[in-house]
Amino acid sequence: MGVGEFSRNLALPLHDIRLQTQVESLHEGYVRTSVGKISGDVIIVATDPITSAQLIGATKAPRMNRSTTWYHSLPEGEITAQRLRIDMKSSGPIINSIAISNLSPYYAPAGKTLVSTTTLENASESEVRRHLAHMWKVSTQSWDLVSKYEIKQSLPLHEVSQPLESSVKVRDNLFLIGDHRGTPSQQGAMNSGRRAAEQIN
């Protein structure tokens, strides 16, 4: 169980999925793709904010944040918390950290705990370890770095003056969904989809 359940469940009722097909333009009642025209009563654009802006002809796309996710393995039981940790004092490069295998044991082998940590700025592993030790109140010297993933355009930047939610309806029968229509998170993306579905029904 984990984030993969989102995509697996979303795909269950779908019978016509086109792979390796690029959407080239949007029109009233249809989209033009690399393999021809696909018609529909409603068009929902659900892609990254830059591609979305290009498809709907927006003059400005949201600015994007880069992020790095760090995965550390440690002995099971060293951390038992199941909640996301946030350093409100910003005393290091980490914005949040969570022992994800405490929520779903499928993320780590028996006897181990997997900690997932996110940084926005460039940081060395030693800086991350020091900040993790501060946040979790444990020594991190024996933690093993499993992997790290750098994503150049991971989340849209939510400006201070920006409303919490933006409209998902672009015009009649055209909707735009994604975390750029709300809070930059999986929750924001899912929420925008729900708002669009409610307006369509």
Each language-model region and where it sits:
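Short beta-strand to alpha-helix junction loop
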Residues: 1-12, 18, 121-123
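Short, well-ordered alpha-helix to beta-strand connector turns
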Residues: 14, 40-41, 171
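Short loop/edge segments at beta-strand edges and connector loops
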Residues: 18-21, 27, 178
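Flexible loop residues that form catalytic
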Residues: 22, 48-49, 151, 179
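Short, exposed beta-strand/loop patches in secreted or surface proteins that constitute
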Residues: 23-26, 166-168
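Mid-domain catalytic core of redox enzymes
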Residues: 24-136
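Conserved flavin/dinucleotide-binding core of flavoenzymes
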Residues: 100, 105-201
